């Protein structure tokens, strides 16, 4: 029987709704969507700048993964939510710099009408610990 554990760290922003930063279930870590909130300030300092937002989102995800005992190389699936698919190539560039190209996870990218706090990008992920 697998166990379920809440993952929480002060090195990533608190959730903006009634959910946890991540849940570890067995050998998997399910990270909730991260937006570009700077955890040190608990605010968005780069609103409207897709490059800076994406970098902050990926940093936040890395911190949540670390709190769960995982690293970015353990990510097996991501979902990217964009308010404008014209930002797709910019996000791809930053994303490819962040993930090892030989070990990039499976991924979906979808356009949505809006995201919390008016951000341009949100990313969630699933990691596998072996």
PLM features: what roles do these ranges have?
Residues 2-130:
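Short, polar/acidic, helix-capping and beta-turn segments at strand->helix junctions
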């Amino acid at each position: 029987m697998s166990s379920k554990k809440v993952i929480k760290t002060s090195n990533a922003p608190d959730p903006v709704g009634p959910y946890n930063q991540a849940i570890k279930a067995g050998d998997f870590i399910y990270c909730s969507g991260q937006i570009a909130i700077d955890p040190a300030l608990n605010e968005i300092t780069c609103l409207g700048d897709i490059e800076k937002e994406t970098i902050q989102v990926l940093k936040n995800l890395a911190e949540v993964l670390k709190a769960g005992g995982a690293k970015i190389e353990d990510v097996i699936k991501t979902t990217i939510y964009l308010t404008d698919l014209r930002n797709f190539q910019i996000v791809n560039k930053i994303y490819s710099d962040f993930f090892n190209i030989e070990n990039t996870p499976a991924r979906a990218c979808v356009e949505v009408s809006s995201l919390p706090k008016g951000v341009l990008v949100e990313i969630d992920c699933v990691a596998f610990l072996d």
